């Protein structure tokens, strides 16, 4: 577990692509669209590094599956709400003390690659 004063390591999931209903406009809610999600999980990974056992670390595959399932089913209106959902899911994982979540909607605004939000949350904010 993370101890006060010790450094937090980072586990990341980069460019996770979900397809889900997201948006405030009627046309955005007609069919699933691409949602791009980036996650940085902050945890003390020293024990996992020493033991070489995934049970002592953060299983990014488990996190990715939960995030994909939620993102594809949630039908949120805003990227802010989806980002908050993802942050909560991540902070439920054992050992994760802080999370940074970026949710983007590629092609949502003309002449831009994507738009979105990036948030940070800590486990203590959920307690």
Language-model features, listed with the residues they occupy:
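N-terminal, polar/charged subdomain of small-to-medium soluble alpha/beta proteins
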Residues: 2-127
């Amino acid at each position: 577990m993370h101890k006060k004063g010790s450094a937090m390591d980072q586990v990341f999931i980069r460019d996770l692509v979900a397809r889900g209903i997201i948006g405030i406009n009627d046309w955005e809610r007609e069919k699933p669209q691409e949602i791009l999600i980036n996650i940085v999980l902050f945890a003390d990974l020293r024990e996992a590094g020493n033991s070489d056992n995934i049970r002592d670390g953060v299983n990014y595959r488990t996190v990715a599956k939960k995030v994909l399932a939620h993102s594809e089913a949630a039908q949120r209106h805003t990227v802010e709400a989806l980002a908050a959902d993802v942050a909560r899911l991540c902070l439920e994982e054992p050992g994760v003390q802080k999370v940074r979540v970026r949710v983007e909607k590629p092609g949502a605004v003309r002449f831009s690659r994507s738009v979105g939000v990036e948030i940070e949350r800590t486990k203590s904010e959920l307690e």
